[in-house]
């Protein structure tokens, strides 16, 4: 499992436990500032999948 998949799974789990999309956007922003773009890709994919 690569970094993107790992963060995708973690993000989906957070949403299922009651986290909001907005909380994931905050997390996305944090990883973007850290320039961890693989993590960003996973979080963004989870947001996109759950927003539809």
Task: Give residue ranges: language-model regions.
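Long, non-catalytic architectural segments outside compact domain cores
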Residues: 1-23, 52
């Amino acid at each position: 499992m690569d970094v993107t998949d790992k963060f995708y799974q973690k993000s989906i789990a957070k949403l299922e436990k009651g986290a909001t999309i907005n909380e994931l956007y905050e997390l996305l922003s944090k990883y973007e500032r850290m320039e961890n773009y693989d993590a960003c890709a996973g979080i963004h994919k989870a947001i996109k999948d759950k927003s539809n």
